[in-house]
Amino acid sequence: MSSHSSDSSTPDRGRLPHHREVSFRSPNPSTPAGEQILRRLREELVLWLTTVDATGAPHSLPAAFLWDEAHSTFLISSTAEEDRDRLIQIQQNPKVGLHFNLDLSGADSFILTGEAKVSLDDPSFDQIPAWVAKYQAFFSQVGLTIKQAAVVSPVALRVRPVTMIARF
């Protein structure tokens, strides 16, 4: 008998949770996975935004975000000066990755691919009630008012998710 065989009574602790890639649809809150994804979209403060430079090398940076359920898009704050390279990369290639933090087991993780663009239509972040509600306590802990944070990161990126890879 192979040491890799398992029966249904023994958990397989050596394997990562099953993952699958699917076209993105707004998560269904009536399913356990959909409920968990929506909770993370609403509550997590940071995701990792991955862009690709002209040579094809990926670059991942943490970013504050707001899930816009009405439009099924992400609103991501970006600084104009420090993120200049990222903004150029998005103009050259709008395909991006959005990675959410995971635990050491790799369970409860999901990665999205999408298309990003600089948004000129969104108001300043301090004028968006959902943004203020989500980030006010965080910024106050680091010594910034929500208005100061909006001045530091004035560029709005909109990301439309295309695919999702999830492990649940």
Describe the function of each predicted region.
Residues S2-P29, A107-F168:
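Charged, gly/pro-rich active-site loop segments
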Residues L104:
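Short His-centered aromatic/hydrophobic patch
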